[in-house]
């Protein structure tokens, strides 16, 4: 893991298209601004972990399309 120290308003660049800006430092909390292409998915850790849990639960579900009633055509 690369560890970098930054002060307020300083930036970190990741590749050519992602820019992180330290917006504010207050106590043990840091506000970070992220500029990235829309195609880059960015999640807070707790949100990402919840998405992963939901995906695992959905894939473990015994549901199948065959369990739906047939609609008349």
Curated annotation (Swiss-Prot):
Region: Disordered, residue numbers: 54-73
Q: Does the keyword Cytoplasm apply?
A: yes
Q: Which domain of life is it from?
A: Bacteria
Say where the protein is mainly found. Answer: cytoplasm
Keyword Repressor recorded: yes
Question: Where is it localised?
Answer: Cytoplasm
**Keyword annotations from UniProtKB, A to Z:** Bacterial flagellum biogenesis, Cytoplasm, Repressor, RNA-binding, Translation regulation
Where is composition skewed (Polar residues) in this entry? 61-73
Give the UniProt entry's GO cellular component terms: cytosol
Q: Which GO terms describe its molecular function?
A: mRNA 5'-UTR binding
For this chain's UniProt record, which GO biological process terms are given? Answer: bacterial-type flagellum organization; mRNA catabolic process; negative regulation of translational initiation; regulation of bacterial-type flagellum assembly; regulation of carbohydrate metabolic process
By its UniProt entry, which InterPro entries does this protein fall under?
A: CsrA (IPR003751), CsrA_sf (IPR036107)
Quaternary organization: Homodimer; the beta-strands of each monomer intercalate to form a hydrophobic core, while the alpha-helices form wings that extend away from the core.
PANTHER family per the UniProt record, alphabetical: CARBON STORAGE REGULATOR
Recorded hits in NCBIfam families, A to Z, give: csrA, PRK01712.1
Q: Which family does it belong to?
A: Belongs to the CsrA/RsmA family.
- Any idea what job this protein has? A translational regulator that binds mRNA to regulate translation initiation and/or mRNA stability. Usually binds in the 5'-UTR at or near the Shine-Dalgarno sequence preventing ribosome-binding, thus repressing translation. Its main target seems to be the major flagellin gene, while its function is anatagonized by FliW.
List the protein's name. Translational regulator CsrA
Q: What organism does the record attribute this protein to? A: Treponema pallidum (strain Nichols)
Q: Tell me what gene encodes this.
A: csrA
């Amino acid at each position: 893991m690369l560890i970098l120290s930054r002060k307020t308003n300083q930036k970190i660049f990741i590749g050519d298209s992602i820019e992180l800006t330290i917006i504010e430092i207050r106590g043990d909390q840091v506000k970070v601004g992220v500029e990235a292409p829309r195609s880059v998915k960015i999640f807070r850790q707790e949100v990402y972990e919840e998405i992963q849990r939901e995906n695992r639960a959905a894939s473990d579900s015994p549901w199948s399309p065959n369990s739906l009633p047939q609609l008349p055509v």
